[in-house]
A protein has these predicted regions:
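Glycine-/proline-rich flexible loop or hinge segments
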Residues: 54-64, 86-87, 326
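Short N-terminal amphipathic alpha-helices
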Residues: 73-78, 83-94
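Structural motif
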Residues: 86-90, 113-116, 171-172, 205-208, ...
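Conserved C-terminal alpha-helix-loop-beta "cap" of PLP-dependent enzymes
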Residues: 309-426
């Protein structure tokens, strides 16, 4: 039996297969560039692990207080080496990316301080953390003020607006690297470095924190290599390599990470406590696999862009642009298009492939959200998934794929569902 015959049994028509094959021929150069990036980052991870003498003992579980957990502590040294920082906090007790960001903000902002976003509104789930939407326990409730500077019409930074917004109260600047549920560009490490340098010129002691979610290992450098004081992310995204069952990380300056550790546990305890509960093998091996897993996800994003831009849909970024994160936005023009696309992604999943995704009122979001994810780890967006809020311009956000071939199947299935619904013609 041929591969195409297997695909046919899974519901992918020859028309879709032929279309996909034709599209693939045009993106070979992008795939070569992605492979080169993966090779660089793989070498970086191996070097950090070798320098820190990873051994089988580092995979041992710890319980209770977690005192003297060398596996946990060594992993944090490895993260610090990869990110070029003084320290890192890498813990299963950090439950998600939003939690990691909330932790970093709450640890380093005090009453009377001001938080500034120079890239417009933050990701939806941070609205409650900051207090944009009144929420118990928010930064606003603790007397931390917030302001944001909108991007210019072309998606670039409004430097004059940023200069005007920075004042004596501005303590921390939060920069979201990835587009989130928006159709603005995601930013390169070089662009982030330019923005951080400008902010430091405006106020030398301001803390610059980058929300690094979805961007790790997509480029050769990380934001902390170009001046960021902290980089924050989730282990069920890129750096967990699809194996980490939970967790988050914060890498940065020692004093800032120490404050994060005290906020995560308790003042006086900090990083000395926090049992690993047996997740170290997954954390280490997931990090080891992450460069190639991220490369697979980026290839899937490029293939998605190439297919849908050929059909006349607006895609951000285009198939020819150099990638800055693993997310691919496709504006599908209608609620029906979003639903059909997500049904295709779900149908390609190894887990819950029989489930039909539908829009629902998801906590933390103002609009209904549709999510397709047949994942081994719940909510792991490094695994093949697609989601988006049901609102204009009806953009769906495709990400993940632990292997390129799974990402490819997901795209083909999305095309098939769109074709079956009469929403595209091939």
């Amino acid at each position: 039996m041929t591969t195409n015959e297997l695909y046919a049994q899974m519901g992918v028509s020859q028309k879709v297969l032929d279309f996909g094959a034709a599209v693939l021929e045009g993106i070979v150069p992008q795939f070569a560039r992605i492979d080169a990036m993966a090779e660089h980052n793989q070498a970086k991870v191996i070097q950090a692990m070798q320098e820190n003498r990873v051994a089988a003992m580092h995979f041992n579980p710890s319980t209770g207080y977690g005192y003297d957990d060398d596996g946990r502590d060594n992993l944090e040294r490895i993260y610090a080496r990869i990110f070029g920082t003084e320290a890192a906090l890498v813990r299963p007790q950090i439950t998600c990316g939003t939690h990691a960001l909330a932790l970093a903000l709450a640890a380093n902002l005090l009453p009377g301080d001001e938080l500034l976003s120079p890239v417009g509104a933050p990701y939806d789930t941070l609205a409650g953390v900051i207090g944009i939407h009144p929420t118990p326990g928010s930064l606003a409730e603790y007397g931390v003020s917030y302001r944001q500077v909108e991007l210019l019409a072309d998606g670039t930074f409004d430097y004059e607006g940023i200069r005007a917004a920075i004042n004596e109260k501005t303590k921390l600047i939060t920069i979201q690297r990835s587009k989130g549920y928006a159709t603005r560009p995601s930013y390169s490490v070089e662009q982030l470095g330019q923005l951080i340098s400008f902010c430091k010129q405006c106020k030398k002691d301001v803390i610059c924190m980058v929300d690094n979610c979805y961007g790790e290992f997509v480029e050769m450098d990380e934001p902390t290599n170009v001046g960021a004081d902290m980089a924050v992310g989730s282990l069920i995204k890129n750096l967990g390599g699809g194996l980490a069952p939970t967790g988050g990380y914060i890498c940065g300056r020692q004093e800032l990470i120490d404050r994060c550790a005290y906020r995560l546990t308790a003042p006086g305890l900090g990083r000395e406590v926090g049992a690993n509960l047996g997740v170290m093998p997954a954390f280490y091996e997931g990090l080891f696999l992450a460069p190639t897993v991220v490369a697979s996800a980026v290839k899937g994003a490029v293939f998605t862009a190439a297919c849908y831009e050929k059909l006349g849909f607006r895609v951000v970024p285009s198939s020819q642009e150099v990638r800055r994160d693993i997310i691919q936005a496709v504006e599908l023009k209608s609620r029906e298009g979003m639903v059909a696309f997500c049904k295709g992604i779900q149908a390609a999943a190894p887990v819950d492939s029989y489930v039909t995704p539908e829009p629902w009122a998801m906590p933390g979001y103002d609009d209904e959200v549709i999510m397709a994810a047949g994942a081994f780890v719940q909510g792991a967006s490094i695994e093949l998934s697609a989601d988006g809020p049901i609102r204009e311009p009806y953009a769906v956000y495709f990400q993940g794929g632990l292997t390129w071939y799974h990402a490819k199947l997901g795209v083909l299935m999305s095309l098939q569902k769109m074709l079956d619904a009469g929403l595209i013609e091939l």
